[in-house]
Curated annotation (Swiss-Prot):
Organism: Acidianus ambivalens (Desulfurolobus ambivalens)
PROSITE patterns: 4FE4S_FER_1 (PS00198), 4FE4S_FER_2 (PS51379)
Keyword Transport: yes
Protein name: Zinc-containing ferredoxin
Post-translational modification: Lys-29 was found to be 95% monomethylated and Lys-101 was found to be 10% monomethylated.
InterPro entries xrefs: 4Fe4S_Fe-S-bd (IPR017896), 4Fe4S_Fe_S_CS (IPR017900), Fd_Zn-bd (IPR009157), Fe-S_Ferredoxin (IPR050572)
Cofactor: record remark: Binds 1 [3Fe-4S] cluster.
Any Pfam family: Fer4_10
Necessary cofactors: [3Fe-4S] cluster; [4Fe-4S] cluster; Zn(2+)
Length: 103
């Protein structure tokens, strides 16, 4: 699953749709972790959509990632500021790719 310490153990390598991206990244095979409040490990995400369905405040939006070995799209936490910390996304993710931490 996602490294719960990624916010301190990984380097911020960029920004995407208003949230930080934690490396390493080497597209299209290695995409890193997107988000700080709601972190999604793009390298673990298999795009089953359970987090998108479970989230009551629409934190996630599909983002196309052609060529990635795990899936061709990812649940991108573009509205992480809206998170109400219900942990629904964390609880339903089949590959434990999400970590939520209040700011």
């Amino acid at each position: 699953g996602i490294d719960p310490n990624y916010r301190t153990s990984r380097q911020v390598v960029g920004e995407h749709q208003g949230h930080k991206v934690y490396g390493p990244v080497d597209p299209p095979k290695v995409l890193g972790i997107h988000g700080t409040i709601v972190g999604v490990d793009f390298d673990l995400c298999i795009a089953d959509g359970s987090c998108i369905t479970a989230c009551p405040v629409n934190v996630f939006q599909w983002y196309d990632t052609p060529g990635h070995p795990a899936s061709e799209k990812k649940a991108d936490p573009i509205n992480e500021q809206a998170c109400i910390f219900c942990m629904a996304c964390v609880n339903v993710c089949p590959v434990a790719a999400i970590d939520v931490k209040p700011p």
